[in-house]
Amino acid sequence: MNQIRDTASDAPAVTIGIPVYNGERYLEEAIRSTLAQTREDLELVISDNASTDRTAEICRDYALRDTRLRYFRNPVNLGAAPNYNIVFQHARGRFFKWLAHDDLITPTYVAKTTRVLEARPDAVLCNSVVAYIDGMGGALGLYDTQLAKADVVSPSQRLAFMTLRSHSCVDFFGMFRKSALDGSLLHGSFHGADRALLAQMSLRGRMVQIPAPLVKMREHEHRYTRAQARAVDRASWHDTRVRRRVSFPTWRLYVEYLKMVQSAQLEPAERIRCSAVLARWWMLNWNAARAVVDVVALVAPGIPGVAERIKVRLFGAAPGHLVAARRR
């Protein structure tokens, strides 16, 4: 793995990690928004998945301008999941945030979210309301993830909030306490891994929301949720090692839920309540139907995308990026 610039002697308080592959169109904006933060004791770790466009050139140029940027390049494209985990493995800060290469954070995002986490040792995650933008940066609308509802004492209530409602997992890109992520699932190599990590974090601590749009998430045609409709393509996007491997993402997600509830440090009564939450999970948000689609996808790889389009046409989109996209 190639690396550019790792000269800082003192560990920063915050790490922002950008995993990227062929991100030349939007990457510079993401870099600039990070380096322009009002809280300056941060590092920006970029892991490049062997990009073939100008990504490496852009990263090297900014690394020469600002010593807070640490650039790593993988010899081959490992897939998104390993690349997300690589930036975390290089993180030295007490607080950590993943930033998609096509998204932006406002100048006070780091200062405000870390201030909350410093004042709230019981919290593992802080994020803000999300402002959606289009490919040109135009406003599409706001998305309130209602993360404040996970700011409760009961782990089972937090788990229910993260698993039983329909949401687009944007809080995966919130500011985490790094110690809470240590030993966690991080980004698993399966569709729904972001949902699994948020559920695991809900068992480890409370989650706090800042009721102001401090992060901008971009909607465009090349976004993963739009570009990868077939099950095999989704699996390969997550991890190139699983190309052509049978994938049952809904079943995998449920198994991960079961494992995290069994391994979490919970009182017996609370563990029972968490298990009851997972029993309800099958009956909500089309999860049972998705499990059937996983099996059908063995012989009809395009069926997940077809099924999702039919559901959206008949019943509407889930809250989040699909709702914002329809406003264009």
Predicted regions and their residues:
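Conserved donor NDP-sugar-binding/catalytic core segment of glycosyltransferases
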Residues: 108-142
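Glycine-rich, basic loop-to-helix element that forms the pyrophosphate-binding segment
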Residues: 74-91, 104
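A conserved acidic beta->alpha catalytic loop
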Residues: 48-57, 76, 100
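Short, acidic, metal-binding catalytic loop of nucleotide-sugar glycosyltransferases
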Residues: 32-41
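Conserved nucleotide-sugar donor-binding catalytic segment
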Residues: 89, 106, 151-231
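N-proximal low-complexity "stem/linker" segments adjacent to membrane-targeting elements
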Residues: 1-33
